[in-house]
């Protein structure tokens, strides 16, 4: 009996990480599994329908269509746009949720009967709360809710990217734009040259 299938007889919790998730690598993994990639692509397509009323606004930020190739051909990456600078959140927020959904589906294929032995708890750190909600929807078999959660992830990402661009937030190497600092004076946050 594998560790994953042993969870069918044991209480367990599901936890979902936030922005520090190496989401591009995780999305690449699921993109090369045709079965998982097709399911996640279906959720993304369903989210397109949810977002149709705001499609034009998303197009002004170049995120009306996510640059995700699911499934991806052998040797190719899932995310067809390079690191996007201030627009990275428009890709990373939904990209993380897509990777988390793919991981959940992979757990079921590895032997976890998530329908008959559901998690005793769900926890999400930061944007991991979106992972919690898409997991709950998926476990309940509510594909429409899963699409709505994914659409929300896309809107949050687009909004974060827009605010980052408007604020002309400086980029520091590989550091993320998704940082919130409170209670610290501007003088401490301003680079001194």
Residue ranges and their predicted role:
Residues 2-123:
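Helix-rich "cap/lid" substructures immediately adjacent to catalytic or cofactor-binding pockets
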Residues 106, 110, 133-138:
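Alpha-helix C-terminal capping segments
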Residues 134-193:
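Alpha/beta catalytic cores of group-transfer enzymes, especially the acyltransferase/condensing modules
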